[in-house]
Amino acid sequence: MRIGIGIDVHPFAAGRKLVIGGVYIPGHDGLDGHSDADVLLHAISDALLGAAALGDIGLHFPNTSAEFKDIDSMILLKHVGKLLAEHGYAPVNVDAMLLLEAPKIAPYIQQMRQNIADALGLQVGDVAVKATTNEKLGYIGRKEGAEAHAVCLIQGK
């Protein structure tokens, strides 16, 4: 068994769609980034890669590559799952935390959990997604961006 941690941050940007955990959330500015800027999936991808000592998402999906411009981060997460399998590992569970003041994420959490489970070949009960605010402190509190943290356990096959 091996454990990995991932953290990602993206600023909000007008004119972008907000996608978190593979779920489109209407009525709010999206996150800015080279890909779709899915902060949750990026943190999970980094945690999985770290657990297997396979680098990070910047190594595998560089933001200098046109190939990954505006790419759906669910594609990246599925690729990370394949990389793990190629190296003899399989995800066991995912525990992730979102930090943002708005929008409220609770109505979308179940779909996020299902999307992540499906992408990684897990049961939905093996995926936890939680959300909290920053109590109006810092860049999160000022609604300038969103942050995600993830811890993932993997095992050798």
From Swiss-Prot:
GO terms for molecular function: 2-C-methyl-D-erythritol 2,4-cyclodiphosphate synthase activity; metal ion binding. InterPro entries: MECDP_synthase, MECDP_synthase_CS, MECDP_synthase_sf. Homotrimer. Pathway: Isoprenoid biosynthesis; isopentenyl diphosphate biosynthesis via DXP pathway; isopentenyl diphosphate from 1-deoxy-D-xylulose 5-phosphate: step 4/6. It comes from the Bacteria. The keyword Mitochondrion does not apply. Belongs to the IspF family. 4-CDP-2-C-methyl-D-erythritol 2-phosphate binds at D8, V9, H10, H34, S35, D56, I57, G58, T132, T133, N134, E135, R142. HAMAP family: IspF. It is an enzyme of class 4 (lyase). NCBIfam families: ispF (TIGR00151). Involved in the biosynthesis of isopentenyl diphosphate (IPP) and dimethylallyl diphosphate (DMAPP), two major building blocks of isoprenoid compounds. Catalyzes the conversion of 4-diphosphocytidyl-2-C-methyl-D-erythritol 2-phosphate (CDP-ME2P) to 2-C-methyl-D-erythritol 2,4-cyclodiphosphate (ME-CPP) with a corresponding release of cytidine 5-monophosphate (CMP). Keywords: Isoprene biosynthesis, Lyase, Metal-binding. Pfam families: YgbB. The record marks H34, T133 as: Transition state stabilizer. A divalent metal cation binds at D8, H10, H42. The keyword Membrane does not apply. Binds 1 divalent metal cation per subunit. One of its GO terms (biological process) is terpenoid biosynthetic process. This is 2-C-methyl-D-erythritol 2,4-cyclodiphosphate synthase. Its EC number is 4.6.1.12. Disulfide bonds: none annotated. It catalyses: 4-CDP-2-C-methyl-D-erythritol 2-phosphate = 2-C-methyl-D-erythritol 2,4-cyclic diphosphate + CMP.
